Amino acid sequence: MSSEGVITSFHRLKNVYFGGQQEHGLRPGTTPVALVAGMGKACELAQAEYKEEAKGNRAIRDEMLDLLKKEGVRYELNGDPQYCIDSTLNICFDGVSSEALMLSTKQYCAISNGSACTSKSYDPSYVLTAMGIPVDKIESSVRISWGPGVQNKDILNNFKEMLRVIKNLAI
């Protein structure tokens, strides 16, 4: 087996540019101009994609809220949707245990009743508590979020199925 083209720790890379000793002598200058330019382009693309993504996420969120109203589900939003992340809803479903809802929908829906960093804690959400939401409302609250790459129809179909479960669990 040939080892051509393999660089080991014993090989010294040759400089392309000469001058300072940044990056262990590989290149001169404090600022890696090519990397800065690349990062700038990446940020430009991310910003352009974000605007489209945010618009689509708001449409999904609005459709979910419309479905809740049409189905007559009792709910309260935790937080002002104008200031929330477009791809996340935190909703209190009156009379529905968030734990029961999570267990009943775990086959097709990834929802949570707290942050990932407190998933082993059974205490009420410290964020919702800080917002002044009563404990009984916190215990009926879930966070629904979705991300890029998930088809809108899949999100909405799963949400419709979740609404069916909510109606069955509501007291």
Task: Describe every region a protein language model picked out.
Residues 43-66, 76-85:
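Structural signature of PLP-dependent enzymes
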Residues 89-142:
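Conserved C-terminal alpha-helix-loop-beta "cap" of PLP-dependent enzymes
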Residues 1-24, 28-41:
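Active-site PLP attachment segment
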Residues 28, 32-36, 50-61, 98, ...:
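Generic structural signal for well-ordered, non-membrane alpha-helical segments
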Residues 35, 124-171:
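PLP-dependent enzyme catalytic core of the Aspartate aminotransferase-like
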Residues 68-69, 105:
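Hydrophobic C-terminal alpha-helix "anchor/cap" residues
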Residues 8, 91-95, 146-148:
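Short beta-strand-to-loop capping motifs
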